[in-house]
Regions:
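N-terminal glycine-/charge-rich "phosphate-binding" loop or analogous flexible N-terminal tail
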Residues: 1-54
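Rossmann-like adenosine-cofactor binding region
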Residues: 178-272
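Phosphate/diphosphate ligand-binding glycine-rich loop within oxidoreductases
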Residues: 53-128
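Glycine-rich NAD(P)-binding loop of Rossmann-like domains
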Residues: 125-159, 186
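NAD(P)-binding Rossmann-fold cofactor-contacting core
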Residues: 167-183
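C-terminal helix-to-coil terminal segments
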Residues: 2-4, 24, 102-110, 124, ...
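Short, conserved loop/helix-junction motifs that constitute active-site signature segments
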Residues: 65-71, 86-91, 222-227, 248-253, ...
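Short acidic low-complexity segments
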Residues: 39-51, 63-65, 184-199
């Protein structure tokens, strides 16, 4: 277990580099440090990088060379996903990904909203092709007659699975290790993946992007997907082979999909996803970082470190999450 002996019992010097919102972030952080009477100080000048013990960092910030911070003991990401950070070869420090209650709630609500949108066939009423009063409808299944598969049962996936169970859907989850979630069937391994793909009316992707999960949704895996299933991806764009997904939609193998994450972001204006009538595109907004809540989560981890405890969300670099 990491103990971070350099900063236990000492004032912690923090450098903040969170992209366009760095100034706002530092103001909120300073207020929270004051309100919580924490023994921490924000280092404003990069020329004092050798004094820095901890870094709060976003992928879109201007910092790329972490060798500038030889005494930094930890890097806190402001995002849940860390695959981009881990590509940086100058990082030798432990990385802690963001685990935040409000972000988790946002993701669970977003996923549930899109499941309900399809389940209730709301698009046919919200976006009708003809402006007419049409009360005819196909009798829909009830929630307890619908099977949902959540791929990825980490913090976000587990919360989403619980939210959908509360709505009476039948929920199963697939992950690297078996998870115990009340009312949710936990599946693992290749057989578990085949089972969840073949039995789910809705597939929700909330996996981290690793060598094992890259393009996990491809031509081969789509062959076993239940005919007419709906796919919702709020994990990472790299989980999907785009061309194979489009073919599955064109053939009717998948009936619809909603995508919040993409292999290239922003999604290029000429990308086929924009023009496909079975694809809903949202611009990576399923679970945005909420400044005040995320800062409180990071400061709670800093308090843990100063007590000699391991931070929540410590990344295993070999696993990429």
């Amino acid at each position: 277990m990491l103990t971070y002996t350099k900063i236990i019992g000492f004032e912690l010097n923090i450098y903040v580099s969170t992209g366009p919102n760095t100034s706002e972030y530092k103001k909120i952080l300073a207020n929270e440090i004051y309100d919580q009477s924490l023994d921490c100080k924000i280092i404003e000048d990069i020329s004092r990088s050798r004094e820095v013990n901890a870094i709060i960092y976003s992928d879109d910030s201007e910092i790329s060379d972490f060798a500038l911070f030889p005494d930094s003991t930890v890097i806190f990401s402001t995002f849940a996903g860390v695959e981009k950070i881990l590509l940086n070869k100058t990082i030798s420090q432990p990385v802690v990904r963001l685990i935040d209650v409000e972000m988790t709630q946002c993701m669970a609500e977003w996923c549930a909203a899109h499941v309900l949108r399809y389940h209730l066939d709301l698009d046919s009423y919200i976006k009708p092709t003809k402006k007419e009063w049409n009360t005819s409808h196909k009798e829909r299944l009830l929630a307890d007659q619908v099977d949902i598969g959540v791929l990825g049962l980490g913090t976000l996936g587990s919360a989403t699975a619980r939210k959908l169970r509360k709505l009476d859907f039948n929920v199963a989850g697939w992950s690297a290790n078996e998870k115990k979630i009340s009312g949710v069937k936990s599946l693992v391994g290749p057989e578990g993946l085949t089972k969840i793909l073949s039995s789910s009316d809705y597939l929700i992707l909330l996996l981290p992007l690793t060598e094992r999960t890259k393009t996990i949704i491809n031509a081969e895996s789509l062959k076993v997907v239940k005919d007419g299933a709906v796919l919702i991806n709020a994990g990472r764009g790299g989980l999907i082979e785009d061309s194979d997904l489009l073919r599955a939609l064109d053939s009717g193998k998948l009936s619809e999909c909603t995508l919040d994450v993409f292999n290239e972001e922003p999604l290029p204006p000429e990308h086929p996803f924009w023009f496909h009538d079975k694809v809903t595109v949202t611009p990576h907004i399923s679970a945005p970082t909420r400044l005040k809540s995320s800062i409180k989560s990071i400061l709670a981890n800093i308090s843990r470190i100063k007590q000699g405890l391991q931070p929540i969300g410590l990344v295993e670099k070999k696993r990429s999450y």
